[in-house]
Amino acid sequence: MFKIGNLELQSRLLLGTGKFENEEVQSKAIEASETNVLTFAVRRMNLYDRNLPNPLANVNLKDFITFPNTAGAKTAQEAIRIAEIANHAGVCDMIKVEVIGDDETLLPDPFETYEACKVLLEKGYTVCPYISNDLVLAQRLEELGVHAVMPLASPIGTGRGINNPLNLSYIIENASVPVIVDAGIGSPKDACHAMELGADGILLNTAISAAKDPVKMAEAMKLGINAGRLSYEAGRIPVKYTAQASSPSEGLGFL
């Protein structure tokens, strides 16, 4: 349906794999979402020790594009090191660059993110940075050569939806690479809204894994994302300040 670098994504829903109650719920939610992209924190995967638990042991990863992230990194060097670990372990070379700058809000550090992206691009990675909804930063990263930008809707795990739709619209309208809205989505309504703004996709985790019924929520998110994309492609009617009748005026003379 759309491409990031040389990778073709069939679904506009990218699914995080953490925080599920158990492997069965995780597996069923993945199936219900119909995603073909699974993202995970490299530090959770125990890539070099098969004796340690693997949180994706029940998933046939050959059926998916695996999308590792650098969660836990606080500096560019840490993010680069995590990406190298994933690459050397044979995981997909598309990397979500996540460098957290504040422990309370979990907002990304723009300076360290930029530096990490610069080095990883030089090393040949497909780079997708997680950023705040900052248009100028998104543009600078595009100029650097990133393959997608991933602006937040609101802080990670808050479920607050899109805090600043105007800024998000600026990023989407000016982007020459795919825009994946990442973090803060709480409901299918939020996901639909982001897609109506023109986002290329949504990355979700907590909104599904922490729902009362993650499997149903995975399906609901899939439908919300599809509806939002269809709405964007169809083109909504313009907002007006005066009423306009939907019925024709012909025939009123008979009244």
From Swiss-Prot:
Origin superkingdom: Bacteria
GO cellular component terms given for this protein: cytoplasm
GO molecular function, one term: thiazole synthase activity
Catalysed conversion reaction: [ThiS sulfur-carrier protein]-C-terminal-Gly-aminoethanethioate + 2-iminoacetate + 1-deoxy-D-xylulose 5-phosphate = [ThiS sulfur-carrier protein]-C-terminal Gly-Gly + 2-[(2R,5Z)-2-carboxy-4-methylthiazol-5(2H)-ylidene]ethyl phosphate + 2 H2O + H(+)
Residues the record lists as binding 1-deoxy-D-xylulose 5-phosphate: 157, 183-184, 205-206
Positions of the catalytic residues: 96
The EC number(s) this enzyme carries: 2.8.1.10
Cellular compartments annotated: Cytoplasm
Class of the enzyme per the UniProt entry, highest EC level: transferase
Transmembrane among keywords: no
One biological process term in Gene Ontology: thiamine diphosphate biosynthetic process
Family according to the record: Belongs to the ThiG family.
SUBUNIT field: Homotetramer. Forms heterodimers with either ThiH or ThiS.
Record function comment: Catalyzes the rearrangement of 1-deoxy-D-xylulose 5-phosphate (DXP) to produce the thiazole phosphate moiety of thiamine. Sulfur is provided by the thiocarboxylate moiety of the carrier protein ThiS. In vitro, sulfur can be provided by H(2)S.
Protein name: Thiazole synthase
